[in-house]
Amino acid sequence: MKDWVKRYNAASVVVAERPEALCRLANSAGAVVCSSLMRCVESRSGLGCDCRAEPDPLFAEAHLPYPDWSFPLMPSRFWRITFRTAWFFGFARHTEPVSESRRRARAAADKLIELAHAHDCVLLMGHKVMNALIARELRRRGWHGPAMPLLSGYWHPSRYSRRS
């Protein structure tokens, strides 16, 4: 699992798959921010927008934990589900604990709200689990948007707006 996690974190993205509607959304946003993970930086670059903000580790994915043993051999999907579930219950071997990811999500929500006040529209190119943690924070603070952004597909945005 250790090697799989390492390869996954170093993997590139297929930028040709990006939908044109997302490119238009990125070009209309006042600010486009992203995680510091390479696949996220590449995804943002593929949007063809003016991306002045530096990639920020604050938005980086809550990495998948893994044990120090390599048996039994099971499909990676099984281990991803097993270890992500275990992570939510406190297993954080080789990664930050869920409490730290939640702290980062609060700080990320602060930053996105600040950017939204300054630029009106902000696009975050992020990652599933961290996006879900950030969404939870935004909704707690009165923002309106999907409760489960984990269910949206790759390249599909989730929109959050201030409640009037």
Where are these predicted regions, by residue range?
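Active-site-proximal alpha-helix that buttresses catalytic centers in soluble enzyme cores
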Residues: 1-58, 75-107, 145, 152-155
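Short catalytic/ligand-binding loop motif for oxyanion handling, primarily in non-cytosolic enzymes
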Residues: 40-43, 62-66, 131-134
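Short, glycine/charged-enriched secondary-structure capping and boundary segments
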Residues: 46-49, 69-70, 137-141
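Signature for phosphate-centric chemistry
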Residues: 58-74
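Active-site-adjacent alpha-helix immediately C-terminal to a catalytic or transition-state-stabilizing loop
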Residues: 106-164
